[in-house]
């Protein structure tokens, strides 16, 4: 769950 959010945030940044 957390790792998935990190991937999304990294994608936005």
UniProtKB/Swiss-Prot annotation:
Amphipathic alpha-helical antimicrobial peptide with potent activity against Gram-positive bacteria, weak activity against Gram-negative bacteria, and moderate activity against fungi. Mainly acts by causing membrane permeabilization. Is also able to kill S.aureus (both wild-type and MRSA) that are internalized in human keratinocytes without injuring host cells. Rapidly inactivates both channel catfish herpesvirus (ED(50)=15 uM) and frog virus 3 (ED(50)=58 uM) over a wide temperature range. Also displays anti-leishmania activity by damaging parasite membrane. GO terms for biological process: defense response to bacterium; innate immune response; regulation of defense response to virus. It comes from the Eukaryota. Its main location: secreted. The keyword Membrane applies. Forms helical oligomeric structures in LPS lipids, the major constituent of Gram-negative bacteria outer membrane. Adopts monomeric helical conformations when bound to bacterial (anionic) and eukaryotic (zwitterionic) model membranes. In Gram-positive bacterial mimetic membranes, the aggregation is weakly pronounced, and penetration proceeds more rapidly and is deeper than in Gram-negative bacterial mimetic membranes where aggregation is high. Self-association is prevented by temporin-L. GO terms for cellular component: extracellular region; membrane; other organism cell membrane. Changing residue 3 to Q: Weak increase in activity against Gram-positive and Gram-negative bacteria and fungi, and important increase in hemolytic activity. This is Temporin-1Ta. Could be used to protect potato plants from fungi Phytophthora infestans, Phytophthora erythroseptica and bacterium Erwinia carotovora, since the analog N-terminally modified MsrA3 (F1MASRHMF), when expressed in potato plants, conveys strong resistance to late blight and pink rot phytopathogens in addition to the bacterial pathogen Erwinia carotovora. Transgenic tubers remained disease-free during storage for more than 2 years. GO terms for molecular function: lipid binding.
């Amino acid at each position: 769950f957390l790792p998935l959010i990190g991937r999304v945030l990294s994608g936005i940044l």
